Amino acid sequence: MTTQFSVAGIELELFRYPASQESNLQAWDAADEHLINTLVEGGQTAVPTAIINDSFGALSCALSRLTPDWPLNVETDARTSFLGAEQNHHRNQLSMENLTWFTSRDALPSDLALVLMKLPKNLTYFAHQLMRLSQVLPAGSKVLVGAKAKSINTSLLEVFAKYLGPASASLAWKKTRVITCISDGKPRALPKEITWDIPEFNLHISNLSNVFAANKLDIGARIMLDNLPQGDFKTIVDLGCGNGVLGLRAAQLYPNADIHFIDDSEMAVASAKANWANNQLPAETGHFHWDDCMTHLPDGVEPDLVLCNPPFHQGEAITDHIAWQMFLDARRRLKNGGILHIVGNRHLAYHVKLQRLFKNCTTVASNGKFVILQAQK
């Protein structure tokens, strides 16, 4: 893994978050480099700029290195993106006084003159981001979006035209392109939340745009809901909660328990919180945390059950370090005798990790693709 970022005369040392993770993945990609080269070669001056979907701060660090007082408005839905950018600014001795942070639900500033974006994997979320920009960008504003060349097609350019303005793609460089979109100045209404029901559990679900499995139960959650453990649990963590469906069902099954919902996505945590209220569950027993796994879970919380449907993607990258951190955090925070109850694809071989960490692992249920595993501290 290389950590030396060297583009257009800008030298940085960049790490993924956390820096201690063992990974051959680097903290930026060629699309980041292409965006920076495009700005520098075009002689871009330091105007109020939005940076959106900057995974670990490569773009904000590069512009801060180029011009320390460049006014940057950084939007992210991922807690690890914020923490990664903070880590890399400190590591490179860059001030963060020129940065203002936004989630994807916060109101954007009205003085933006330039936008730099990375194309996210979730195109529904991307359309939502374009609609947000349409509400604040005046006609003629420039939006530059870096992406893999293979991800850019006529349909994607039509998404730009529908939600923000006309767009065209650059020539390919290192298998990436930069899309230039010019705002047409016409505000678009933001999409309504997606809502759906799970009648067999009497649950009503709503999702914001960057939440996994937007309008139905994913297969892993389905098998998990059918195989939750029996017991008199008092403190439960829904780790990587998404829309919160596992924790909501847990609240029905274990009515005396406090349920803690944790996700890296701010939209996921907001969706889980809304679903808790919409399903008329008691406000005092639902707790919601936008966090990197259980890193900042309050010290007094000692779960006796952790429910987990681990992701194996971080943005475009396929990685198992998130699952590994979830399992490590569960072992660290569970009370003695507490249970980690997970679902995963068979091919991911999570049983090996759990056996290594907990010295025990039981198969609770399985089908052709998924397996439910349980380990006890």
UniProtKB/Swiss-Prot annotation:
- The source's superkingdom equals Bacteria
| MF-aspect GO terms | 23S rRNA (guanine(1835)-N(2))-methyltransferase activity; nucleic acid binding
Q: Which family does it belong to?
A: Belongs to the methyltransferase superfamily. RlmG family.
Q: What is the lineage of its organism?
A: Bacteria, Pseudomonadati, Pseudomonadota, Gammaproteobacteria, Alteromonadales
Which residues form each disulfide bond in the chain? none
Its Enzyme Commission number? Answer: 2.1.1.174
Protein name, please? Ribosomal RNA large subunit methyltransferase G
**Gene3D superfamilies, alphabetically?**
Vaccinia Virus protein VP39 (3.40.50.150)
